[in-house]
Structures are given as structure tokens and as C-alpha cells.
């Protein structure tokens, strides 16, 4: 009976550890996604005015890939994100694929509690966010 009790306790501890690690990864991913959302909005605000097609036309917001990436990195630096997240990187695909949408892709390493010795480099997570600027009167 003692062996059975010890076995159940070990299984319960194992389940609790796995749930705790999975919850930690999930929460860190949500934090990274929130950071990516803020960076994409900041990047979408870095537009320049496009050329007018005709005299009565309305100006358009034009984004460049380099400017989007620069604005995203600046946003992350101002918010201390590089200190909060381990191995935080801005992916090379960050930019503006169509000149109107800012796409920010962030990647970081998560170190879950208790099971950190099993994955010493951490678990890589990635968050993608898009934002658009629209001019209106």
C-alpha cells in the first residue's frame, strides 16, 4: 500500500510540474504577443505620405520595411523588452510586405520553472502581429 501511495504522489507531482511548465510557456507567449502588438502599432505609425495620383486625390500612408523594423526595435528598446525576455530577437521577416501593413515577428526563449534543467537553452516562442495605418478626415 505504501508503494502505491508513493506512486500516486509521484504521478501527481509530475502532472503538477508539467501543468506549471505549460502555463509558464503560455503566459510568456501572451506577454510576447502583447509586446508584438505594441511594436506593430508603433511601426504602423511610422508611415510616410505617398504621392497623390491626381490633384483631387487623397494622400496614402506608405510603409517601408526598413522603417517598420527600425520603429519596432526602437519600441522594444524604449519598453525594456530586451531585458525582460531572454534572447529576444526581431525576425528578418519583420517589415511591410505590401507597403500598407506593418508585420512584426518576435522570437524569444522561455525558461519554464522546475523543468529548466531539461531544456537549459529554453523553449523558443514566436509571436506575429500586423497593423495598418489609415488616413481619414
Annotated model-derived regions:
Residues 1, 7-9, 15-16, 77-79, ...:
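Short secondary-structure boundary micro-motifs
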Residues 1-68:
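Alpha-helical assembly-interface signal, strongest on the long, hydrophobic N-terminal helix that forms
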Residues 42-105:
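Short amphipathic secondary-structure patches
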Residues 106-112:
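Generic short beta-strand segments
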Residues 112-137:
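Low-complexity, S/T/G/P-rich flexible repeat/linker segments used as non-globular hinges
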Amino acid at each position: 500500500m505504501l508503494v502505491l501511495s508513493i506512486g500516486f504522489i509521484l504521478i501527481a507531482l509530475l502532472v503538477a510540474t508539467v501543468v506549471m511548465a505549460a502555463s509558464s510557456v503560455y503566459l510568456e507567449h501572451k506577454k510576447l504577443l502583447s509586446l508584438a502588438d505594441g511594436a506593430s502599432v508603433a511601426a504602423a505609425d511610422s508611415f510616410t505620405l505617398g504621392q497623390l495620383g491626381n490633384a483631387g486625390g487623397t494622400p496614402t500612408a506608405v510603409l517601408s520595411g526598413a522603417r517598420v523594423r527600425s520603429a519596432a526595435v526602437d519600441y522594444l528598446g524604449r519598453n525594456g523588452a530586451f531585458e525582460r525576455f531572454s534572447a529576444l530577437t526581431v525576425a528578418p521577416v519583420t517589415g511591410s510586405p505590401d507597403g500598407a501593413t506593418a508585420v512584426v515577428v518576435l522570437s524569444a526563449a522561455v525558461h519554464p520553472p522546475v523543468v529548466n534543467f531539461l531544456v537549459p537553452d529554453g523553449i523558443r516562442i514566436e509571436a506575429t502581429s500586423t497593423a495598418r495605418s489609415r488616413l481619414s478626415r
